[in-house]
Each structure stands twice: as C-alpha cells, then as structure tokens.
C-alpha cells in the first residue's frame, strides 16, 4: 500500500494506525489532496496562520499545514488522534494541538478545514459549534466524496452555519465552502435522551454515537442474551457505544466490575453517563478511549461483550473485528467467554473458530439478520 503522499513538490510518509503488516488501506484520500491543493494554490496564506482541522483521519492535513502554520486538530476518534500523533512524529512535524470532540471548540482561527463526518448528527453538531465559535470572516472548507454531498448536506451547512457553495468535482471529491454568517441559524441539542422499550434503562447519546435516537436491532437482540453469573467478577464491553450492553450486564451482575471501551470519545462519555445514571455512581466502573484492548493485562476478564463495527471512518473493513477478537482472547481468563453479535453475512463464526478452536465456539441465538456467538477460552489457549 502506498505510504508516500507526494504533492506540490513535497512529500509525507503517512501510515494508518494501528500499523498492520499487510495494510490494504491508505492513510489519506483524494479529499485530503484536494484541500491541500486548493489552500496552497488559491488562498495564498501568509505563514503563521491559526488553522483548525476537524476529523483529520490519520493526520495528513495536520502534518501538511503544521509546516508553516499553527494547527489545532479536533477529533472524536482515539485511533485518528493516535495515528495523527504517530505521523507527526514520523515526519518530524511542528507541534500540533490535539483536542477531543468532548472538549469545547476553541476560537480565534483564520481557517477551518473539515473532513465531513459520516454521521449527519455529528456534522450538524460541528456546524453549530463552528457557527458559535468562528468569526464570520473565517473561511470554512469541507470535503467529502462527491456522491456523499447531497442537496440535504448543503442545506445543513446553510441552516446551521451560513452561506454555502461547492466546487467542481476532482478525483471524485468535492469541496464545500462556507462561512459562519447565518443570521438565524437552526440549533440542535448536544445529546438525545430516550428510554429503552421493555427495559429499565434510560439512555443518552452524544452526537457521534451510533444509533443516536433509538436502540439498534442488534443491541436489542443482544440484551436478551447477556448472562447473569456471580463468577463474572470483571466484564468488558468492547466497542461499548452508549454503554447499553454494560448497563444490562450491570443490572444482571450487580457485583461485577465493568469496563467500557470504545475508540470514540463521545461514546465513552455517553457510556459513563448512562452507567452512572442507571446503575449508580458507587459501582466499580472504568471508561477508556482506546484502540481495542491495547495495554490491557492478560487473563484479566471473565466476559467480553462485543458488537464490532465493520467500518473505520469511510472505509469498510473487517480488520477491527479481528483485532477485537484477538485482544479479547488475550485478556480473557481460562474458561472466560467472548460474546459477539454481528450480521449473519459477516462470517464471525469462521473467524472465532480459527482463533478459539471450532469446539469452543457455539451459536447462542440467531434471527433473520443477526447471530450471537460465544467463544470460550480453553485451558490450553495462550
């Protein structure tokens, strides 16, 4: 896979995070290149400008513009943040301020660059924050694949931010130009709250959390099959999202210590709030933004709950699920269990059989769309 971004007589060595031996995906896309070309060739910025970059996937924009400008990068992704840091170090770039989506959006910028997020609610929230934080004279330039920029996308920019126009397509990407000058902008609440039908669970979701306004079908199915066992002293919810599986696990296992892990900072904060509200602040909880289970101790958990994502940013991939399964096996105690839910077509059973052994993988439940699998760590497993 290509790792050298060469553009305008400059080059950067950019790699995805975590680094894999046989990486199939590139650490930047044509959208990054389009923004770089436009800013360098059309804006003629003086050195030392203050630039805010939103949703930089693996730091291509941050690395490029930190050469001559003061860059702040804001993201909801732990993986993107860590990947950006690694690429900054790899290319010996100037210091970039890295902040998370759960922090207040800073002010005082001369230019804002944005990779448009996949989640429309996250986009709307970021546009509202830009409208409230940026001066009307500050150019805001966003990018996405042309096929993903619809009239409804531009309406969001107009409604929540200000006057908006688009560029011609280049390498199947399009730029969106806007300013924070809407005279009467629409507003959106930071969080959505609702109660889970037929469960004693109240949930709050911050903008970038999956299934923002209702419980997704997979999670609902999984709730019916979370075990209750006094031997489950430590339960990990891997890819926790809003923490609904952790809440149910905590209700069924009141003595268990629960750890919620997700790569989304907003997901981790949603889970923190939801466990404290539904289970009480006095319980033993841990909330970690992380790349899967990096840094977790071996043989430290009795049950891992997992609802793996099959995309990373805009890219569809199954390597995240595989890493989750490998990490879960590593940290499970002997006879510990990994409980996984996924769409039937994703072949998680094949992956789990390869990893845990066919005799240690069983189907707990299935319906027309989902399957729940249990993998047990046998005594001989490492």
From Swiss-Prot:
It catalyses: guanosine(1835) in 23S rRNA + S-adenosyl-L-methionine = N(2)-methylguanosine(1835) in 23S rRNA + S-adenosyl-L-homocysteine + H(+). Belongs to the methyltransferase superfamily. RlmG family. InterPro entries: rRNA_m2G-MeTrfase_RlmG, RsmC/RlmG, SAM-dependent_MTases_sf, Small_mtfrase_dom. It comes from Aliivibrio fischeri (strain MJ11) (Vibrio fischeri). The lineage of its organism: Bacteria, Pseudomonadati, Pseudomonadota, Gammaproteobacteria, Vibrionales. Specifically methylates the guanine in position 1835 (m2G1835) of 23S rRNA. Keywords: Cytoplasm, Methyltransferase, rRNA processing, S-adenosyl-L-methionine, Transferase. It comes from the Bacteria. Its main location: cytoplasm. One of its GO terms (cellular component) is cytoplasm. The keyword Translocase does not apply. This is Ribosomal RNA large subunit methyltransferase G. Its EC number is 2.1.1.174. GO terms for molecular function: 23S rRNA (guanine(1835)-N(2))-methyltransferase activity. It is found in: Cytoplasm.
């Amino acid at each position: 896979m290509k790792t050298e971004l060469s553009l305008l007589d400059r080059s950067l060595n950019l790699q995805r995070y975590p680094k894999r031996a046989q990486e199939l995906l590139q650490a930047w896309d044509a959208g990054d290149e389009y923004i770089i070309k436009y800013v360098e060739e059309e804006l003629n910025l003086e050195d030392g400008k203050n630039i805010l970059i939103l949703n930089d996937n693996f730091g291509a924009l941050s690395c490029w513009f930190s050469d001559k400008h003061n860059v702040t990068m804001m993201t909801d992704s732990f993986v993107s943040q860590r990947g950006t840091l690694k690429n900054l170090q790899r290319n010996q770039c100037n210091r970039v301020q890295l902040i998370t989506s759960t922090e207040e959006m800073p002010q005082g910028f001369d230019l804002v660059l944005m990779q448009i997020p996949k989640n429309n609610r996250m986009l709307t929230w970021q546009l509202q924050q830009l409208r409230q934080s940026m001066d009307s004279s500050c150019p805001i330039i966003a990018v996405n694949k042309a096929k993903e920029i619809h009239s409804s996308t531009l309406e969001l920019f107009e409604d929540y931010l200000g006057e908006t126009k688009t560029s011609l397509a280049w390498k199947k990407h399009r730029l969106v130009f806007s300013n924070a000058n809407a005279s009467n902008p629409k507003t959106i609440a930071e969080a959505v709250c609702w109660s889970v039908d037929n469960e004693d669970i109240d949930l709050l979701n911050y903008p970038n959390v999956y299934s923002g306004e209702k419980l997704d079908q997979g999670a609902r199915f999984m709730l019916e099959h979370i075990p209750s066992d006094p031997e489950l002293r430590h339960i990990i919810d891997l890819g926790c999202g809003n923490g609904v599986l952790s809440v149910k696990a905590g209700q069924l296992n009141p003595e268990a210590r629960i750890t919620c892990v997700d790569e989304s900072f907003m997901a981790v904060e949603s889970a923190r709030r939801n466990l404290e509200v539904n289970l009480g602040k006095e319980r033993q909880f841990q909330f970690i933004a992380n790349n899967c289970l990096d840094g977790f101790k071996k043989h430290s958990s009795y049950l891992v709950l997992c609802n793996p994502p099959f995309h990373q940013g805009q890219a569809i991939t199954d390597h995240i699920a595989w890493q989750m399964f490998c990490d879960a096996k590593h940290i499970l105690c002997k006879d510990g269990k990994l409980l996984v839910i996924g769409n039937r077509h994703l072949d998680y059973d094949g992956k789990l059989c390869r990893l845990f052994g066919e005799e240690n993988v069983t189907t707990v439940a299935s319906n027309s769309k989902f399957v729940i699998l249990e993998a047990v760590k046998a005594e001989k497993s490492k």
